Structure formats: C-alpha cells, structure tokens
C-alpha cells in the first residue's frame, strides 16, 4: 500500500451559515451558483485535496441558513482554526463556518438528524423594506399573529401534509411529525417558527402562505385544519416566497455532542 492509503480518514462536522439570496439553492448544480459548490471549493483549498460534503437539509434557491450542518471525510490533519477561520477566508462573504467538531464514523449530517427547525420572517408593513430586503418576505396587509398562532396548532403531531406539499416533491410519503409551530410578532416582524422530524418539499413555505391568508382575515382560523384534512394541494394558498425562510437548527442525538450556537437569525432568541 502507498503512504496515502495508510493515512487515517477523519470525519468532520461543520455548522454553516449562509445568505441564500444569490444562490440557486444548496445543492451543487452545473453552471449555476450553489452554496455547496462554494463550501466544497473552500474546504478543498484548506485540505489540499478534493472535499465533498453531505448536508442536513438541501435548501431551495433564495432560502437562508443559520444552522445548516454538514459532514465530510478527509485524510488531511488540520487544526480547528484551519477548518473555521481558514475556510472562512476562502469563502464569499455570504457563507460562513460557525463551528467545527470531529465526529465518529457513524455520524451522518442527514441520516443522524432527528429534527429540523425553520423560521420564516415576514416584514408586515404597508411599504417594502430596503434594508435586509432579501432576508424577509414583505406582506403589506395587516396580519393578526395571534389568529395565525391559533390556526397553526392544528398542524402539530404526525399528519399527512399532502395539502402543503409541492407537486414535484419526491418524498416517498407525505407524513411528517410537527413538534411545534409558533407564530409571534416582534414589532413590524411576524415570525413563524416550526420544528418537525423532517419536511416535505416546500412544506414550510406552503404552510406560511396559508397562515398569511388566515392572518389577513381572508380565511377563518378553521381553514388550516380543513386544508390538512383535505389532502389537496390545490385548495391551499400560494407558496410563500423563499426570501423569508431560514434553516435555523438541526437536532442530533446527544452522544454526538455537537455545538449549539444561537439560532437567530439576527435578534431572534432561541
């Protein structure tokens, strides 16, 4: 065997934050910008060998992340500062490594995850924002966040989310277990916070689109429960825009002991 083949392989996990505004989603694609492509390029420069990453959840074009988790394997030995500060020095300003952790061989960023948590931020004022405009979704009609909160509670538990599932979704089943969903107002901002074991394609944005109809008074509070029972995507509201959506946290078994930095984004407390 060669000397290279004898080198031990290390599995490393990273926490990643990114502004998805200028990317065609997380996943590497030919001829378009992706978060994965930029991260793998920066990691490969630091490792001095090709690096491929696996992520906890592939976000769509325009969607952001403050709590994305990835893992990769390498024979390169580097200090933690190289995998954080060094990689960040090679990344564009809208992508950053938040933490690094050596993990055992049975850790997998996607398959070891037990839950994912998203936050959707709505800027609820008559006129659009100029600052952070790509990090929020503007909705000009007044929203009743308390009404939205009450309506949303019908989604908690294990349910068939066909009514909130994109037509092109490739998941084998529409059943998901929603652990919590909370709608809160912070001044001009309405935040929808939802955690589930996993999500079908566009599930959060489809739920938010329908909740905004309830919050604006266009539909009764009971409408969300009716949509869930109907199992018909055509009856629900339009998909909410990507700009306001953030993957903020991914849960793993405690034995992996991964860091838990503040979820955010920005001023939002855990």
UniProtKB/Swiss-Prot annotation:
Claim: Cytoplasm is one of the keywords in the record: no
Biological process (GO), any one: tRNA pseudouridine synthesis
Enzyme class: isomerase
InterPro entries hit by this protein: PsdUridine_synth_cat_dom_sf (IPR020103), PsdUridine_synth_TruA (IPR001406), PsdUridine_synth_TruA_a/b_dom (IPR020097), PsdUridine_synth_TruA_C (IPR020095), TruA/RsuA/RluB/E/F_N (IPR020094)
Pfam short name (any one): PseudoU_synth_1
MF term (GO), any: tRNA pseudouridine(38-40) synthase activity
Catalytic center residues: 60 (nucleophile)
Region (Interaction with tRNA) location: 168-172
Region annotated RNA binding, chain positions: 107-111
Lineage: superkingdom: Bacteria
Keywords carried by this UniProt record: Isomerase, tRNA processing
Annotated positions binding substrate: 118
Function: Formation of pseudouridine at positions 38, 39 and 40 in the anticodon stem and loop of transfer RNAs.
Quaternary assembly: Homodimer.
Family of the protein in this entry: Belongs to the tRNA pseudouridine synthase TruA family.
Protein name: tRNA pseudouridine synthase A
Taxonomic placement: Bacteria, Pseudomonadati, Pseudomonadota, Gammaproteobacteria, Enterobacterales
